Amino acid sequence: MSQKKPRAYSVYLLFRFCFSLLFSMATVLSMVYHLKVVGLNSLQLVLVGTVLETACFVFEVPTGVVADLYSRRRSVLIGVFLYGVGFLMEGSLPWFGTVLLAQVVWGCGDTFITGALEAWIASEEEGKPMDKVFLRGGQLGQAASILGVILGTLLGNVNLQLPIVLAGLLCLAFGVILARIMPETRFSPALEDRKGLIKDFASLFRLNLRFVKGAPVLLALLLITFCGGLASEGFDRLSTVHFLNDTVLPDFGPLNSVTWFGFMSLLGSVLGILASEVLIARLEKQGISSRTGIVMVTSAGYIVSLILFAVGNHFWFLLAMFLLAGLTRTVRTPVITAWMNDHVEEKMRATVFSTNGQLDSFGQIIGGPIVGLVAQQISVPWGLICTALLLVPSLFLIPIAAKSGHHQSN
């Protein structure tokens, strides 16, 4: 008799915990690793991110189609294994070329997970309020990130390559465990009449395109995601350089100064957990009507805090603005995802979510080199200011999404 698999919601929370732990462990000091071990300059740092986002952009929709046509569970498993291989490659071979190649590998892995995971849990737990599911998953992921940050920072004090390599090995082991326990009981292919791989891809893509065109709220939300992509790569790639070049890191006891980057990530995770709890309580009390205000406030907060982060030079002020910018971005994402989920048909969830991820990547592909060149030719603070301004159009798109969603519901 085969052993009964755990409930999907429990596996989803386990996934968010374990994967966040491993991802944080691998990436908490990755910028420092790229700067101090691989020896990258500001433009190369941004190019690493651009290659990663290009891989995500190229593979995002095809992998979403795979998830909707074949299996969302299988798509998630492939993604976890690719992450493991990518981390091993990046940590083992500290050269610019292999770091770029590693971004392609684990960037492709990310596209297999993005969209498929959200579509899988939304189908398996049909009827549950997805705002709470996604926020609770994000909250647990933030808690796991704390452990990952601690482990990654301690291991990085020994050797900056060690946490990346170990995370890669553990990703492979987690993939094996996940293959045994992850259920998939409510999946039905988006296309019943199959005509071959290429024709199926084309048919589902056209079907999704017609669906999105007929849903103005989805168009607005997808454009908001695109603006978020434009405004994220510069923050991700230049904030570490800003701390190292434009301020003095205080001593951190017996540990070296790079420990501050682990501590910043730790603080960000704690704040993310607390903010998610506040949002869950607000959504339970006020319902989905509060989404518009949440997305508007967090978007405006990100713009203001990032500009203040860019112009500051005192460490404690920079730390406060850095944490605020990261916090607003963290709590904004799951609310937008749940908002989008309410307007997507079940059979097309993974592909629409993947399109959302692709637009995020496309935004980063465009925004990354722009802010990288500004940082290289003028200064890093000006690159960060440029990053913040790229999110401004989303402030005009949020009311459009709210109005369109209201009309569609009526």
Q: What are the language-model segments listed below?
A:
Residues 81-95, 300-313:
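C-terminal ends and interior cores of transmembrane alpha-helices
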Residues 32, 36, 146-167, 241-252, ...:
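Transmembrane alpha-helix termini and helix-breaking/packing motifs in multi-pass membrane transporters
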Residues 167, 172-194, 399-410:
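Helix-loop junctions on the cytosolic side of multi-pass membrane transporters
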Residues 1-6, 181-222:
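Juxtamembrane intracellular "pre-TM" segments in multi-pass secondary transporters
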Residues 103-143:
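Cytoplasmic helix-loop-helix junction between adjacent transmembrane helices
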Residues 56-94:
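Conserved MFS/SLC helix-loop-helix module at the cytosolic interface between two early adjacent transmembrane helices
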Residues 2-57, 217-265:
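Helix-loop boundary and gating motifs at the non-cytosolic
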Residues 76, 292-295:
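Primarily marks hydrophobic transmembrane alpha-helices of the MFS/SLC 12-helix fold
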